[in-house]
Design a protein with these regions (language model features):
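Structural helix-boundary/capping segments
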Residues: 1-83, 91-103, 172-199, 207, ...
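Alpha-helix boundary/capping residues
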Residues: 40-44, 125, 137-141, 149, ...
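Serine-dependent amide/ester hydrolase catalytic core
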Residues: 78, 114-118, 138-245
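N-terminal beta1-alpha1 cap of cysteine-dependent amidohydrolase-like domains
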Residues: 80, 90-93, 97, 107, ...
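Short, solvent-exposed loop/turn segments at secondary-structure boundaries
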Residues: 84-89, 121, 225-227
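General small-molecule cofactor/ligand-binding pocket signal
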Residues: 106-111, 251
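Short low-complexity, flexible loop/linker segments enriched in glycine and/or proline
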Residues: 121-127, 227-229, 266-268
Length: 290
């Protein structure tokens, strides 16, 4: 699965959840297929105000060229710095590091200090934006309408039936974070973490072509298995949130199977508008993992 550079793929026609975070990217059976689809759907769209006018380089150009002398940074905070990360996941991530090194890349451990605070920051920023964006779905102007005896009852009925439990939970979190007396204490601090994270990434990308981490601290869980445990689902976002907060591209590549028979993913992160190198490294990782 691919998360492109923020603004690299048009979001026109998309339901907005968190406007500064929402992105569209492909799922595919191979890195090459993902790159091809990305080339097709990417590019400037005047109907999307966040769309980047800069033309991206073809994402398939570097496929098959190897990764000799590319510099890869392994984010230590997302390896051993996560509470509860699976030993199996760490082992597979270390195997991925070895595979890239054997393929000619220069692989080194790096530090991304702000990554330790990203999970908390994300679950303040995203729900806050969702609370604002989804307030328009009142049954009058957009979307589903459920009748009531008066306007207030119609609004309540519409939002009660139109939003699932997780959406309601995030709206409540966001409304609380934006409420008087809590904005500076929570939302304002989350934005500071976001700025600090962007600075951390900028410093790393001065010296490294891409970064590497696990995709998740555990193997994939089955669909619906954790629905009643939202905190577990939130915590499993810890590795993928950093690139999303700053709008940088990232790709998750399957790299082995855990003892429970479920897949383990390795994530490659890249500087904005530099997906071609990201795909180049991901292809090497894909070949090593098959």
């Amino acid at each position: 699965g691919v998360k492109p550079t923020y603004g690299g793929v048009s979001r026109y026609g998309l339901l907005a959840f968190a406007s500064s975070l929402d992105q569209v990217g492909p799922f595919a059976n191979s890195v090459k297929d993902a790159a091809i689809v990305h080339e097709v759907i990417g590019g400037f769209d005047p109907l999307d105000s966040t769309s980047i006018k800069e033309a991206p380089s073809p994402f398939t150009d570097l496929l098959g060229q190897g990764i000799n002398n590319l510099k890869v940074g392994v984010i230590k905070e997302l390896m051993g710095g996560i509470d509860g990360i699976s030993d199996e996941v760490i082992a597979r991530a270390n195997e991925a590091v070895t595979a890239l090194s054997n393929a000619g890349a220069q692989v080194e451990e790096v530090s991304l200090p702000a990554a330790l605070y990203c999970l908390s920051a994300y679950y303040l920023i995203a729900p806050a934006e969702a609370s604002s964006n989804l307030s328009r779905y009142d049954g009058v102007r957009y979307g589903l309408r459920v009748d009531g005896n008066n306007l207030n009852e119609m609004n309540i009925n519409t939002r009660t039936e139109g939003f699932g439990d997780e959406v309601k939970r995030r709206i409540m979190l966001g409304t609380y974070a934006l409420s008087a007396g809590y904005y500076d204490a929570y939302y304002g601090k989350a934005l500071k973490v976001r700025r600090l994270l962007a600075e951390n990434f900028a410093d790393l990308y001065k010296d490294y072509d891409v970064l590497l981490s696990p995709t998740s601290p555990c193997t994939a869980f089955k669909i619906g298995e954790k629905v009643s445990d939202p905190m577990t689902m939130y915590v499993n976002d810890v590795c993928t949130i950093p690139s999303n907060l700053v709008g940088h591209p990232a790709i998750s590549v399957p790299f082995g199977i855990g003892s429970d028979g479920m897949p383990i993913g390795i994530q490659i992160l890249a500087p904005p508008m530099n997906e071609s190198v990201m795909y180049q490294v991901a292809e090497t990782l894909e070949q090593a993992g098959t």
